């Protein structure tokens, strides 16, 4: 192709491209003109719609609709003309029927919300939530979860179907988290001129000028000169009466039981007919929940009642009767469990006396060192197994029971404990692990922290599709341990020690007990067959062994047991509830025990184990004591406060232990932190921990928690466990932080009422 041809084609191509560009530009110009016309037309139409609708068309409509505006308007319209209707009247019952054996029977019942009465039903459950949570609620995550759970529970109580429950709960949440007419009227009243005038009048009275100023302002007033005369003669000036909050440190004397009844031929009584030596219970009542505690004196009257009612007799229909005995052959039925326990636990040998002594610290170590030394000079004797009985220095709640039977402690001699401890002290932990394996997971909650216990409960809970927990314990477990029960327990030990004759002789001393109890004003001498003697080396081990194996024998279903002596929680499927409840009480009675089963619970936080409940802190589970009980009980001390320094040392010890156990937990964290702040820089007294070697101090031994921010999930879980709403938690924490504990010991006074809301009767 030549050069001329290329030039011709180039000219033609340029002409065509230019033409196309011109056509495109013309088309864009035409479309722009049309767009301007359309825009102007829409503007005119929009202006016409705005004018004709009065501006209502400017409100953006949600694609999902906005029915809650009508709900709120309906509440405002009905607020002054409320017709009382129960939620059941606002729902419709639907019965699902089926034919069984030729007959039509009702298989299930459910309720649906009547669509014509939906708004009234929603307002009804919203009002219940308002009343429960205390009006206007802060919009926190914890409150959102708590209110949602509460509303869902109200729908479940009426058996509302899930779809309608979701619809009604979402609508009711709007009403709960917005102020209603009552709250608006209340705030309007508080902000009114009349209310302001009252506040000014009160402030003017409380802030009165001094008597000298009043005399200068009113020199002709006779009352002012009379007031001056009174002041000159040593009287106080005329001031408004104020009512300061009570609260401080004081002590209470020990108490005597007022009940004397019964007697037993095996008990020799010697009444000294003189006043008893009184114990003291020290109290701080600046921060408390209202429960009052006392301590029993170690006196003849208390010792007598404690022995008769906690060792020899049980109460039935307000009469003292002998303890029930197990059915003949009942413990022989459990021979297969003893053999299984032996296979899992294995054989063991006793440890040396020095190894046993090394297991203890402080004063108890010294006692056992001396006992071990005496055994080198003189072998164990029968009298070493005799009991030395005394009244336990224990705080008891007078609000729950004003005059309970005192608890007795019945230890044997340290020489006997050393000999038996050489067999059972180290063996005890192997026995617990064997019980764990028999039950298929951690079962005996000895030696665990509160977090570990809660985690074990959570793991057991998650092993079931529809879990339910049934708590149960045996009324006065130790008292109901019969000779047959002791013989079965001892046979488990002897199997693991290959029938050791010396161990058999030591255990035989527990079958027939000889004891004496000395008080400051009398004494008692007695003989008792069987019965667990609190103070024996094998008290905890024996109780756990019996509780775990008897329950395993009774429960022929898939289940998990959480145990700590006589305190038990059984977790299983909901379909097995009837089987468990019917077999627990009747089954345990065959072994001579009085089993008390609690109501089944279906939520983790509702479980009660050792007077604690599981609470989720946002990262994991931990066991938390009921604040209503713990904050009052930890306000009472069995350690003497001889001076202000001793009181501060006790406050610091309790506060630090409490923070290690309950750091990051609502309310109680601030309670223990206040103890630490009140103690200041006082030096710790390690003797206090030894004197107060209770479960509280032992729980804190391995705990590692501390003061930290409370998570929203923890507030919600705490509400689930104890019923204290998140807003109430925050309010109480602020109140605790504002209070001051006076560490000067003074006369007894009434407790401060700042934490009244924790009392269950107000909830």
UniProtKB/Swiss-Prot annotation:
EC number, as in UniProt: 2.7.7.48
Catalytic reactions of this protein: RNA(n) + a ribonucleoside 5'-triphosphate = RNA(n+1) + diphosphate
Broad enzyme group: transferase
Highest taxon above the source species: Viruses
Coiled coil feature spans: none
A Pfam family matched in the record: RdRP_3
An MF annotation (GO) of this entry: RNA-directed RNA polymerase activity
Record key words, sorted: Nucleotide-binding, Nucleotidyltransferase, RNA suppression of termination, RNA-directed RNA polymerase, Transferase, Viral RNA replication
Occurrences of domain RdRp catalytic (ranges): 467-580
GO biological process, one term: viral RNA genome replication
Extra remark: Readthrough of the terminator UAG occurs at position 246.
Described function: RNA-dependent RNA polymerase that plays an essential role in the virus replication.
Protein name: Probable RNA-directed RNA polymerase
């Amino acid at each position: 192709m030549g050069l001329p041809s290329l030039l011709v084609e180039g000219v033609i191509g340029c002409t065509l491209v230019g033409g196309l560009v011109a056509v495109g530009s013309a088309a864009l110009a035409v479309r722009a003109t049309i767009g301007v016309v359309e825009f102007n037309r829409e503007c005119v139409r929009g202006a016409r719609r705005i004018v004709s609708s009065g501006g209502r068309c400017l409100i953006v409509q949600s694609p999902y609709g906005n029915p809650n505006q009508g709900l709120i308007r309906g509440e405002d319209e009905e607020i002054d003309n409320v017709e009382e209707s129960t939620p059941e009247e606002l729902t419709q019952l639907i019965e699902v029927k089926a034919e069984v054996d030729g007959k039509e029977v009702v298989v299930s019942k459910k309720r649906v919300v009547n669509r014509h009465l939906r708004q009234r039903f929603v307002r009804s459950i919203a009002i219940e939530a308002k009343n429960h949570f205390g009006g206007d609620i802060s919009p926190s995550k914890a409150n959102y979860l708590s209110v949602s759970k509460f509303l869902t529970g109200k729908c479940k109580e009426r058996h509302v179907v899930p779809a309608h429950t979701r619809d009604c709960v979402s609508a009711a949440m709007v009403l709960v988290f917005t102020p209603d007419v009552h709250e608006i009227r209340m705030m309007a009243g508080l902000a009114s001129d009349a209310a302001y005038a009252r506040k000014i009048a009160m402030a003017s009275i409380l802030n009165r000028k001094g008597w000298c100023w009043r005399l200068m302002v009113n020199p002709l007033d006779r009352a002012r000169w009379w007031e001056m005369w009174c002041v000159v003669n040593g009287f106080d000036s005329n001031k408004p009466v104020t009512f300061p909050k009570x609260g401080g440190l004081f002590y209470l004397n020990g108490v005597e039981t007022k009940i004397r009844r019964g007697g037993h031929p095996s008990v020799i009584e010697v009444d000294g007919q003189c006043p008893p030596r009184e114990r003291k219970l020290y109290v701080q009542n600046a921060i408390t929940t209202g429960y009052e505690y006392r301590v029993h004196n170690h006196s003849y009257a208390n010792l007598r009642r404690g022995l008769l009612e906690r060792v020899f007799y049980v109460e039935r229909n307000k009469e003292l009767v002998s303890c029930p005995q197990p059915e003949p052959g009942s413990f022989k039925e459990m021979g297969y469990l003893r053999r299984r326990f032996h296979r899992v636990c294995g054989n063991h040998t006793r440890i040396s006396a020095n190894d046993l002594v090394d297991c203890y610290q402080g004063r108890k170590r010294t006692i056992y060192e001396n006992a071990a030394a005496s055994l080198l000079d003189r072998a164990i004797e029968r009298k070493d197994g005799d009991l030395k009985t005394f009244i336990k220095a224990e705080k008891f709640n007078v609000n729950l029971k004003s005059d309970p039977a005192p608890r007795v402690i019945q230890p044997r001699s340290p020489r006997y404990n050393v000999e038996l401890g050489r067999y059972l002290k180290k063996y005890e932990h192997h026995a617990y692990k064997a019980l764990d394996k028999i039950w298929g997971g951690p079962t005996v909650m000895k030696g665990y922290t509160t977090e570990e216990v809660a985690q074990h409960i959570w793991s057991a809970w998650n092993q079931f599709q529809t879990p339910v927990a049934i708590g149960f314990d045996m009324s006065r477990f130790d008292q109901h341990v019969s000779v047959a029960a002791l013989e079965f327990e001892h046979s488990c030990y002897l199997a693991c020690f290959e029938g050791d004759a010396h161990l058999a002789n030591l255990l035989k001393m527990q079958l027939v007990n000889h004891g004496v109890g000395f008080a400051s004003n009398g004494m008692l001498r007695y003989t008792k067959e069987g019965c667990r003697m609190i103070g024996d080396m094998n008290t905890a081990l024996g109780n756990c062994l019996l509780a775990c194996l008897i329950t395993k024998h009774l429960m022929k279903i898939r289940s998990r047991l959480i145990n700590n002596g006589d305190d038990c929680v059984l977790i299983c499927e909901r379909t097995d509830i009837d089987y468990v409840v019917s077999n627990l009480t009747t089954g345990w009675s065959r072994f001579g025990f009085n089993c008390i089963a609690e109501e089944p619970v279906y939520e983790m936080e509702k479980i009660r184990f050792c007077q604690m409940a599981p609470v989720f802190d946002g990262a994991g589970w931990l066991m938390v004591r009921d604040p209503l009980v713990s904050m009052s009980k930890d306000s009472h001390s069995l350690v003497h406060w001889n001076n202000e320094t001793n009181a501060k040392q006790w406050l610091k010890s309790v506060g630090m232990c409490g923070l290690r156990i309950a750091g990051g937990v609502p309310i109680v964290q601030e309670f223990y932190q206040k103890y630490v702040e009140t103690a200041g820089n006082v030096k710790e007294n390690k003797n206090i921990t030894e004197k107060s070697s209770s479960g509280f101090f032992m729980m804190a031994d391995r705990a590692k928690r501390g003061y930290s921010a409370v998570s929203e999930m923890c507030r919600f879980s705490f509400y689930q466990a104890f019923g204290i709403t998140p807003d109430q938690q925050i309010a109480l924490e602020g109140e605790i932080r504002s209070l001051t504990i006076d560490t000067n010991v003074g006369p007894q006074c009434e407790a401060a009422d700042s934490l009244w809301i924790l009392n269950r009767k107000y909830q």
